Design a protein with these regions (language model features):
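Hydrophobic, well-ordered beta-alpha structural blocks that scaffold small-molecule cofactor pockets
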Residues: 1-52
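Alpha-helix C-terminal capping/helix-to-coil transition sites in glycosyltransferase folds
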Residues: 12, 87-89, 135
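Residue-level detector of alpha-helix initiation sites
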Residues: 22-23, 100, 146
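N-terminal beta-loop-helix "entrance" segment that forms/cooperates
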Residues: 45-72
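Glycine-rich, highly charged phosphate/nucleotide-binding loops
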Residues: 62, 69-87
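ADP-ribose/adenylate-binding Rossmann-like module
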Residues: 91-96, 102-129
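E1/E1-like adenylate-forming module used to activate ubiquitin-like modifiers
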Residues: 118-167
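An accessory alpha-helical subdomain
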Residues: 146-211
């Protein structure tokens, strides 16, 4: 059965990522891209994760606990995973190179009703990551239900030709004028007509009107 597409506001929501390798790094990037607060539990972290933080992270990380990033949105905990790490989290990502450990994490999270993704272990996932394109608040995402990541990457490549930075800016503009248009026109039909006219004019002219 296909996965239900649901867009969730992750701003300031607590997300745990277990593992410190390149796969974990890619998941960290995604979660930060959508505003989550990320905790990484790992005995060691890859250079890419180190480069996300301040220059002396190598020294700070040795202390065992380090909160990084100017916005204090990443916490690194240097040790092996413990089940209690999942408690209080809204989302958990098991991204270690140990399939048995990933399965254990997934089983614990499911028992606690915590959303969990075990990388490359579809049966252990209560959610999966889509391929996505993001221009500000405009997001397009593709999922194959975990069957064919190469297909979703193909679709993402096609969509990138359409979903441009201009459309991201245009979407921001449409959001800025939304309440004004709603207040000015009484019926849904009128509002839809005005929004469509503004949208089409901006696309045809290749220019976003001033607010």
């Amino acid at each position: 059965m296909a996965y239900f597409p649901m867009f969730v506001d992750m701003t300031e929501r607590e997300c745990l990522i277990v593992g410190g390798g390149n796969v974990a790094y890619r998941k960290v990037i995604v979660m930060l891209d959508f505003g989550a607060k990320v905790t990484v539990v790992a005995e060691d972290i890859c250079d890419e994760l180190r480069n996300l933080t301040i220059d002396d992270i190598s020294n700070e990380y040795k202390s065992g606990l380090y909160t990084a990033n100017k916005e204090n949105r990443i916490t690194f905990i240097k040790r092996r995973f413990e089940r209690k790490d999942c408690d209080g989290m809204e989302m958990v990502i098991a991204a270690t190179d140990d399939n048995a450990l990933n399965h254990e994490i997934a089983e614990y999270c499911k028992a606690k009703d915590i959303m969990v993704n075990a990388v490359d272990q579809k049966a252990d996932c209560s959610f999966i990551f889509p391929s996505y394109i993001k221009e500000k608040n405009l997001v397009a995402a593709f999922s194959s239900g975990g069957n064919s990541p190469v297909l979703t990457q193909y679709l993402k490549g096609k969509e990138q030709e359409i979903l441009t930075p201009f459309l991201g800016d245009l979407n921001e503009y449409m959001g800025q004028i939304r309440e004004k248009v709603i207040a000015q026109y009484d019926t849904e039909a009128e509002r839809k007509r005005v929004f469509k006219e503004i949208l089409c004019a901006a696309i045809d002219n290749g220019r976003i009107p001033e607010v």
